[in-house]
Amino acid sequence: EGRLESVADQDPRKGSICIPNSGGCTGYTRLVPVTMIDVAGLVPGAHKGRGRGNQFLSDLARCDALIQVVDASGSTDIEGNPVGSGGSNPIQEYEFLTAELDAWISGILSNGWERGARRVQAEGERALNDFILDRLTGIGANERHVSVGISSVNEANPDAGMPWTWTENEITILASAIRTQLFPIFVAANKADKASTESW
C-alpha cells in the first residue's frame, strides 16, 4: 500500500513517466528547452568598465551557465585579435574569464561593504546573509550561493574573523565561491584541429 512496484527489466521506460509541462520526450527521455545567448566582447578590465564592460557582465547575469569558447590553436591574443602563433592559451583564457567575473562580483560586494558590515555587527550572522543576498540578487544569487561563499571564506581562512574585519582577500574568496556556484563554466575548444602542443 502506497509503495511503487520495482521496475521490471523488460520495461522500456525504465520507470520513467514523461509528461512534461514544457519541452517534450523522445523515447522516454526528457527534452528540456534552453535558451542560449551569445555574449561577445569581454576584454581585460571589463569589471572596471573597459570594452563593453559592465554591459557584458550584466548580460551574463541572465545566464544559468556559461560556455566559454576558447582558441585552442593559440593564434589570438586574450582580446580575440589574430596574432599568429604565440597568442594566449586556453588555460589563460579560462583564468582570464574567471578573474574578470570574480573581480566583478567583488566590486559589487565591496561597494557598501563597510555599511553592511556595521549592520552585521549590530544584527548578527543572519544580517550578513541578507546583506550579501541583497547585493547579489540582481545577478541571480540565492541563499545557497551565499552560504557556500561564507563557508568558503571560513574554510580558506579560519582566522578571517568577523565580516567587518574582512580584507579584500576574504571578499575575493567569497566572490569566487559564489561565482563558481552561480556561473558553472564549460569550455569549448575552437580551432582544436589547428592546436599545437605549445598552445596548451
Where are these regions (language model features)?
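Switch I (G2) and immediately adjacent beta-strands of P-loop GTPase domains
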Residues: 1-47, 58-66, 71-72
